[in-house]
């Protein structure tokens, strides 16, 4: 009887809380001189690092908020490489948009915005579901945080044959492809040449994502696949990292890069700098120097390209097709349109396109929005990015950390890498699931089931 009463009281509390939240939006409209003033219509485009941070920190009482994104979850991208090899499960690094905050405080539409009309204060929206007609939505304020796309540099065959690593479905495809390569290589009738191709894994791009995926892949092989596929010749497994420039991890200090390279070479990873890709075919990649490298899996991680919505917009853009914003993140010439993250650049600043910048700028903008009606005679301070450091996992329980004050490497760098990302996860659920996955992998190994 006591438990039943407790459940009923809990339901009543939740119902009252949700009703109050919605009533606050509907009834506690701001009043000035006896007139009811409707909340401004605020549309947020995207649900990446910027948009997610902005939504979490925004005071929803002042706005009628609508989030529009074809992806219905926030993705913790720094750990995407871990999910691609089974160290973490996919759901552990994804946070549904609808659970970001009280669902009565905003609307979510699973759709893509195909065009923006800033003169008419409207966006054209197309549902992600088939055969849905586009529709127009009006806004008083617009926040653009659609992120970026994969950059193929126009190289022939990349779109058709390479695997990207930017979304959850990319990680799922890569994990399945790795397992498929080992299963096919273990067939009794496979030729030596075909087996060597299947066991060659090529990663294009020596930035943080390329380095971390290479590290995770090598861990997957040395800790799990080599044990579970005993008849696959160890000496035939090749991991090749291609970097067009002369240096991997170009944003890190050279001494940390050297430590990463030593770790890679000790693991048998083939790092090739000054190696530009000319063309990607179904079974091999052609380099500028004419070399042909056969592969079973090729992962493309070579920087970012701009979102079509941004590229085709009428906003003023920089040489990298990013929307130019002022130091208050307002789009040039439009005081009611704002942008942050990979798709925007503060004029004359050239901040790096990282999750750090996107998150900090979004929190800044949310505070600006929250303070708009406060009687503050002082103008708001401009946005200033605060560098918090660079992190990268380099395999074999080793990592590197670079800050303005100190550097770390080795096992302590690995612990710092994990700790830093654990604290940055978006929800309590993720903060419980991720360490649970780490412990499961440590005890039982990574899952190699195909599904």
Curated annotation (Swiss-Prot):
Name of the top EC class for this enzyme: translocase
Gene Ontology cellular component annotations, sorted alphabetically: mitochondrion
Entry binding sites for NAD(+): 199-236
Pfam families: NDH2_C, Pyr_redox_2
Keyword line: FAD, Flavoprotein, NAD, Oxidoreductase, Translocase
Listed cofactors: FAD
Enzyme Commission identifier(s): 7.1.1.2
Binding-site residues, FAD: 41-71
Catalyses which reaction(s): a ubiquinone + NADH + 5 H(+)(in) = a ubiquinol + NAD(+) + 4 H(+)(out)
SUPFAM superfamilies assigned: FAD/NAD(P)-binding domain (SSF51905)
Family: Belongs to the NADH dehydrogenase family.
Protein name from the UniProt record: Probable NADH dehydrogenase
Organism of provenance: Dictyostelium discoideum (Social amoeba)
């Amino acid at each position: 009887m006591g438990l039943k009463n407790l459940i009923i009281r809990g339901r009543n509390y939740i119902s009252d809380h949700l009703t109050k939240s919605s009533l606050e939006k509907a009834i506690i409209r701001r009043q000035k001189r006896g007139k009811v003033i409707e909340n401004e219509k605020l549309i947020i485009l995207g649900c990446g690092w910027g948009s997610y941070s902005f939504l979490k920190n925004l005071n929803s009482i002042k706005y009628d908020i609508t989030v529009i994104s074809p992806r219905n979850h926030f993705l913790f991208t720094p750990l995407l490489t871990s999910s691609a090899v089974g160290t973490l499960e996919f759901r552990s690094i994804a946070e549904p948009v609808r659970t970001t905050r009280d669902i009565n405080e905003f609307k979510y539409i699973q759709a893509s915005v195909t065009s923006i009309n800033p003169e008419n204060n409207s966006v054209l929206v197309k549902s992600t579901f088939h055969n849905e007609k586009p529709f127009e939505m009006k806004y008083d304020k617009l926040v653009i945080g659609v992120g970026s796309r994969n950059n193929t540099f126009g190289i022939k065959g990349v779109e058709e044959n390479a695997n990207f690593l930017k979304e959850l479905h990319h990680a799922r495809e890569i994990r399945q492809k790795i397992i498929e390569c080992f299963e096919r290589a273990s067939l009794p009738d496979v030729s030596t040449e075909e087996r060597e191709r299947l066991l060659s894994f090529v990663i294009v791009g020596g930035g943080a994502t390329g380095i971390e995926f290479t590290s995770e892949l090598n861990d997957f092989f040395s800790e799990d696949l080599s044990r579970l596929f005993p008849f696959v010749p160890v000496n035939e497994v090749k991991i090749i990292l291609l970097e067009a420039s002369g240096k991997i991890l170009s944003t890190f200090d050279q001494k940390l890069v050297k430590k990463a390279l030593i770790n890679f070479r000790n693991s048998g990873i083939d790092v090739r700098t000054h190696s530009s890709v000319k063309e990607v075919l179904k079974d091999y990649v052609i380099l500028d120097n004419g070399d042909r490298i056969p592969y079973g899996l090729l992962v493309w991680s070579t920087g970012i390209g701009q979102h079509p919505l941004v590229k085709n917009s009428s906003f003023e853009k920089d040489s990298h097709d990013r929307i130019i914003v002022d130091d208050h993140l307002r789009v040039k010439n439009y005081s009611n349109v704002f942008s942050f993250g990979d798709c925007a650049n503060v004029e004359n600043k050239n901040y790096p396109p990282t999750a750090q910048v996107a998150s900090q700028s979004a929190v800044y903008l949310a505070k600006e929005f929250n303070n708009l009606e406060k009687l503050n005679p002082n103008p708001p301070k401009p946005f200033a990015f605060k560098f918090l450091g660079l992190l990268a996992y380099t395999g074999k329980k080793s990592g590197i950390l670079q800050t303005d004050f100190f550097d770390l490497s080795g096992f302590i760098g690995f612990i710092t890498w994990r700790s830093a990302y654990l604290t940055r996860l978006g929800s309590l659920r993720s903060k419980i699931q991720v360490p649970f996955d780490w412990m499961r992998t440590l005890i039982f190994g990574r899952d190699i089931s195909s599904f």
